Structure formats: C-alpha cells, structure tokens
Design a protein with these regions (language model features):
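Conserved ATP-binding subdomain of kinase catalytic cores across diverse folds
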Residues: 1-120, 124-127, 168-192
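The start of beta-strands in P-loop NTPase/AAA+ ATPase cores
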Residues: 48, 150-152, 156, 170
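An alpha-helical support segment within catalytic cores of ATP-dependent transferases
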Residues: 119-154
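Conserved catalytic-loop position in the HRD/HxD motif
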Residues: 157, 162
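Conserved tyrosine-mediated DNA breakage-rejoining catalytic core shared by Y-recombinases
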Residues: 165
Length: 192
C-alpha cells in the first residue's frame, strides 16, 4: 500500500515514525514498512508518503465487532480479548522505543486543554451529547487533579477503524498519524 499524506507539516510524520519504530523492533502489531519519501521546501521537511505491507483479506475491527454484536454475540470473545492485548502490546512497545517523560504541571495542563478542545468539537458535531457536557467536564477536572503516570508516545487517532483483522495473523494496527488537521506539535507530544 502506498499512502500519500494529504496534510504536510514540518517534521517527521508520526505515522512513519511510530510504525517504523515498531517495525524495527519486530512488532507484529503493525504492517511491515518498506520505506518512505521525504520532501523539503523553504525551511521545512517532512514525510510525504510511505509504502507498507498490503494486508490481504483484512476487515476493520469496527466491521468485525459490529458483525459479532449483530449476530447476538454479546460476550467478550477471543477476538475482543486479542484486540485488548494488541492495544497493550503497542503501548508497551512504544514505551520501549521512545523515552517516557514525567507528567509535569505544564504537560498536564496542555493535555487537559486539548481534552476540552476535543470535547467542544465533539459536542458541536454531535449536539445529542450536550446533556453529558457537565459529566465530561467534571471527569476532565477530576483527572487533572489525580497523580499521573509518566507520559509516552501513543498511537494517534486510535479506534476500531484503524485496526484490521487479518486472516492467519490476527489484529494489526495502522494509521498512527493522528488527526492530520491537529498541529503536528500536539500529535507528537507524549500522552497518557
């Protein structure tokens, strides 16, 4: 698969950087990466495309899970358990590949501010969630005031649509770019 990045920002693209680190560590949680192309312009340089392994017969996790639920399988299945294990493996492997940092007051405030921004966008996009606004904000306020673990690099925009079930291999995660319209500086900073 050849992926061309539609939004370019000066600096390493997290999709290339994170998957390259996981692939180099021998992770089976991501497609093998064959290479990337960098582009340069006045005062800037970034990845413009990446070539990755094509995953034959893959179905995205959203499709797999909703099919299971629609079939009446409401219990935790091996597939769901394996999906949780994949998520843990990716976070552990990223923690080993990139240096964790302390959750300073400044880092905490920056992350909490991003949570508020995302919540505002989500509530604007889905007005039916407005009745939950107070609970969401209260949760963020409470999270700000507890002890935080160290922060580390995490997969960006990680959700069921970014995970594929591959016959004979199991779950594989892709698209570590994060939300491309968010500033690169936010997408590469260590997180929870």
């Amino acid at each position: 698969i050849l992926k061309v990045f539609r939004v370019l920002s000066d600096g390493a693209n997290p999709d290339v950087e994170l998957q390259q680190a996981l692939d180099a560590a021998g992770s089976q949680a991501v497609p093998r990466q064959y290479g990337s192309v960098r582009g340069a312009w006045d005062g800037g340089e970034t990845d413009v495309l990446v070539a990755q392994e094509f995953l034959v017969g893959a179905a995205d996790a959203w499709q797999v899970i909703t099919n299971e639920l629609n079939a009446g399988h409401l219990e935790v299945t091996d597939e769901i358990r394996d999906l949780g294990a994949l998520t843990a493996d990716i976070h552990r492997e990223l923690g080993e590949a990139f240096t964790a940092v302390d959750a300073t007051d400044e880092a905490r405030e920056a992350l909490v501010a991003q949570w508020y921004e995302r919540a505002d966008r989500a509530l604007s996009d889905a007005p039916e969630l407005a009745e939950h606004r107070t609970a969401i904000i209260d949760t963020f306020d409470q999270a700000r005031d507890v002890d935080w673990p160290t922060l580390q690099r995490v997969p960006g925009d990680f959700h069921l649509g970014q995970v594929l079930h591959v016959p004979g291999r199991g779950w594989v995660a892709l698209d570590f770019e994060g939300e491309p319209l968010r500033p690169l500086s936010q997408r590469v900073q260590p997180d929870l």
